[in-house]
Amino acid sequence: MREDKKTIIVFSNDMDKVMAAFVIATGAAAMGDEVTMFFTFWGLNVLRDAKKKVQGKSFLEKMFGAMMPKGVEKLPLSKMNFLGIGPKLMKYMMKKKNVMMLPEMIKQAQELGIKMVACSMSMDVMGIKKEELIDGVEIGGVATYLGEASEAGVNLFI
């Protein structure tokens, strides 16, 4: 086990929870720790690139994709979502207080060398293709996560 290694499972696509995951991850990486973020189920929506279009999806995959937020700009809040007004208010307050927005946090995470892994099984179940993910994301299964987690001093589930 290495105290300088951290893993975070990102299961949620709630904006506030995702922000917490990236704040912890970038903070640890800035302190010199090795960080792996494993995105599974709803957390995969964080990695979807709103600008990318993918061909060849089945009808059900298209419907599933249409019902999920595509990218970090569309994420709901876990509390006080208010039909989508909550995230807008949160972003307004963040900007006013000079808090880094999620797209910038993701970019910073990549610059800090944080490994971002998308769960292959969840991608398959939810009809998410590698081509629609942001650049720099690795694909891996539960064995990938467990291999990283078995060496880490801290493992979080968000």
Language-model segment annotations:
Residues K5-T7, F64, A152-G153:
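Polar low-complexity intrinsically disordered regions
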Residues M19-G32, M37:
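Histidine-anchored nucleotide/phosphate-binding helix
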Residues F82-G140, T144-L146:
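A charged, amphipathic interaction segment
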Residues V35-F41, V117-S120:
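Short internal beta-strands
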Residues M1-K6, N45:
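Secretory/periplasmic and organellar redox-cofactor proteins
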Residues Q55-M90, N98:
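A glycine-rich helix N-cap at a beta->alpha junction
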Residues L44-K57:
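N-terminal beta-loop-helix "entrance" segment that forms/cooperates
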Residues I8-V18, L47-R48, Y92-K97:
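Short, glycine-rich nucleotide/cofactor-binding loops
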